[in-house]
Amino acid sequence: MGRTDVVIAFDFIDAFGLRIEEMCRTKLEYLMSALKNGQLVIPKGKGGQKRNITLDPTQRALIVRYVEYFQARGLRPGDYLISSSEKHGVWDAKRSLQNWMSYNREKFMVKDRDKIVEEGKKKRHATISWHGLRHGYTQKTHADALIENLKQAKKIVSENLGHHRYKVTRIYLAEENPKKKAQ
């Protein structure tokens, strides 16, 4: 398929739960700063909100690998990872990634994925999407946080996603609504 932008987007959206537009706005300087500070800062998320994602060892290793990759290709700190510019480049990159997903998802998507049901979780969508990677990130982060500290799990996941209500985070976790389940 030959699309390095797609590989980069997959890696970062899966590892950090970024929205596709946040990925398209990510600059090399954000990665360099994350290595110094231990947090990836998303300065302009949904609704203009800033959020910080504390790096775990796997995320740190991913950033190290990509900083080396981009520096070897001559990117400067202020350069976008996959977009050409702020004005039109972010929109163009986002549209290009969305189109790629639309035309290629059948090549790597599990057949009949909407029929795979995990106990305690909602039914999956029939197709995958970039936003679906964000759901996967949420579920992995939540499971890891549960191991660490049950009480902090919801807070950690909600903060990393840039949401302040657990009700919204529950959607990403594919949890059934406890009120509906009781009925």
Where are these regions (language model features)?
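Alpha-helix N-cap/helix-start motif at helix boundaries, enriched for small hydrophobics
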Residues: 9-10, 21-26, 157
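Residue-level marker of regulatory loop/turn positions in helix-turn-helix DNA-binding domains and
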Residues: 1-2, 12, 122, 126, ...
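Basic, Lys/Arg- and aromatic-enriched nucleic-acid-binding interface segment
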Residues: 1-16, 20
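Active-site-proximal segment of tyrosine recombinases
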Residues: 23, 128, 138-141, 145-162
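Active-site/catalytic core of tyrosine-dependent DNA strand-transfer enzymes
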Residues: 58-125, 131, 137, 142
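Short, cationic motifs built from Arg/Lys/His that form the positively charged side of catalytic pockets
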Residues: 5, 18-19, 46, 51, ...
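Conserved tyrosine-mediated DNA breakage-rejoining catalytic core shared by Y-recombinases
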Residues: 25-68
